[in-house]
């Protein structure tokens, strides 16, 4: 199985280079001020200019207003990852307004019934991202994971990706259980919240290549 990887929360040239040279298929930038990984669109633009065209540039946004969406599109993003409480109606508006941008919707998962949320976004988004539900102000990047067995044999109605508590040590098990073909890692390649580690990025991507 060929598994692709999104390294999320990149904020420096050094960690960006580690992700690119070790084979990341997607690079994620966080535009949420409460996150320790937050970057301004202007900084993201400088980093995006260093990324080869074949790698997707995804912006993580939490209930963004139209002005922020315009700014991050101008920075060069190819996709939005909506990680807040965006309703299907709001997502439909974003889709109409930015027809060339790929849209992901992050869905917090605790139990099997949570997977039904996917149906509300069918036809509106290009991909859903299954992530662990968090208790705090941050919707993701907390190192928490959900029960991967919930995805075993699940009939996915659209393209999807797996996130939540992934690292180099558990990625093989996560993919074996879920069948994920795209995985998303953030805290699992950090030494502290928001501090990406080049060696951990390389180790994670090497572990994915060995699957």
UniProtKB/Swiss-Prot annotation:
Catalytic activity: N-(5-phospho-beta-D-ribosyl)anthranilate = 1-(2-carboxyphenylamino)-1-deoxy-D-ribulose 5-phosphate
A Gene Ontology biological process term: L-tryptophan biosynthetic process
CDD domains in the record: PRAI
Enzyme nomenclature, EC number: 5.3.1.24
Record keywords: Amino-acid biosynthesis, Aromatic amino acid biosynthesis, Isomerase, Tryptophan biosynthesis
InterPro entries in UniProt: Aldolase_TIM, PRAI_dom, RibuloseP-bd_barrel, TrpF_fam
Record-level Gene Ontology MF annotations: phosphoribosylanthranilate isomerase activity
Enzyme class: isomerase
Functional pathway: Amino-acid biosynthesis; L-tryptophan biosynthesis; L-tryptophan from chorismate: step 3/5
Similarity-based family: Belongs to the TrpF family.
Protein name: N-(5'-phosphoribosyl)anthranilate isomerase
Species this chain originates from: Zymomonas mobilis subsp. pomaceae (strain ATCC 29192 / DSM 22645 / JCM 10191 / CCUG 17912 / NBRC 13757 / NCIMB 11200 / NRRL B-4491 / Barker I)
Classification of source organism: Bacteria, Pseudomonadati, Pseudomonadota, Alphaproteobacteria, Sphingomonadales
